[in-house]
Structures are given as structure tokens and as C-alpha cells.
């Protein structure tokens, strides 16, 4: 169960991470504290997912660096445009046998609330439930700053579906190695 939760979290972050490779050096850091991020897949029979993230400047940069750098290596196009308070990111990235072309529009403030609208098109790779091959998918994210992190949270903690994990631990094995 924990491994599936990690996989789902990583999938969501990498899907959103399509904006990170192009924007990692350009996006301002989010305000330190507790953020709630609601992810909604549009036009697919997938329930909305809400996650909370306790961040500070270091863990926000770590997230951008980990997911942004990994994805950047796989992207042939990364274009970012800033117009006032709107950031637009276009990218073409290859992951295994799949090529993902994405367009993201980011609005709002990284101090209080922001919205990310992502549309993407996949070519190749395994089929996704509810998505025709080559079909477009849409996802929206709404990030809201809730205040200070709870006393039992440390920067990098993410809570999704009632389970807590830390961004620093995502690459670590779930089960300790056998002696």
C-alpha cells in the first residue's frame, strides 16, 4: 500500500513536474509553511486528490531540483514565458516509450494561493484508463497557503490520503535490505 501511495504521489508530481524542467530556475519559491494542493483531472473518472505539504526554502528547492532536473534530462523543448503575474510553460519530454507534450499556465501568488492549468498529450507508451491514444488530458492544481506547519511536521512532509511521507525519503527503499 505504501509503495502504491509513493508511486501515485510520484506520478502526480511528475505529471505536474512537466512545468518544473523549464521553470525551475524561473519560478519563485513558495512561502514557507503548510500548503494544501488540490489536483483535479478533468474529463476522466479520477477522483480529486488533495495533499498537504510542509515546506521551507530548502525543501521547496529540493522538490524543484529533484523533479525538475530529472525531467529536464528527458525534455527536448522547454519554453517559459512570463507576462505580468502569468507564467506559461511549454515542454516536450520523453519518458521511456512515451512522449508528452504539455502546456501549463500558472497564475496567482507563491505567497498565498496559485493555480496551475496543465493540458498534455501523450504519444506511445501504455494506455491510460479513460484516455484515447494521442488524446489530450487536462489537470488543474490549486495551491493554498494554510499557515505554519503543525508541531509534528518537519519541512518536506507531504500528507496524501491520510498518509505522511517526506520528500527527502521518496527515493529510499520501502523495505530495509536483508542482511
Model-predicted segments: where are they?
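N-terminal helix-cap/turn-to-beta initiation motif at the start of protein domains
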Residues: 23-33
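Predominantly extracellular/secreted and cell-surface proteins with exposed
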Residues: 53-110
